Amino acid sequence: TDSAVTTNRLSSFYRTAEKFGVEIPDEYVMMTRYRDTKGAGEATEKLLDLRRPPTCILYPDDFAALGGIHVIRERGMSIPEDISIAGYDGIRLAKLTVPNLTTLCQDTQHLGQYAAEKLIDLIEKPKTAMRNITIVQGKLYEGQTVLKLDGSRG
């Protein structure tokens, strides 16, 4: 979907890939709605049907990753041996999947506190409120859905 969050995440993704010398083919980037397991499953099918499918799929959230896992397993593929996957959000359910989902966990407590502070500023001082973008650091939860470059799970 086309939202500020999606645009910012995608821009950051492309910048990071470029920094490491990784080129991302346009056909590897597919948009789905957040928490849409069905849409993510359909996008996964399209990616797997490409002449040169990706070796890793990064999903916009953990629920989308669950939709992808379903499609990958239906095709008889193994995660991460045949394809690596990673999610985003760090929901508890990600730690219950087999194998455990590799995911980027957001510090939602810090994010909520920061948002509340900004909202209070906006209410109390509407004339001085400024729009800004804040980057909140995440923490990688290393599940077992991404194959390391040496061939081991990580």
Give, region by region, the residue ranges found by the protein language model.
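Bacterial carbohydrate/catabolite-sensing allosteric modules
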Residues: 1-154
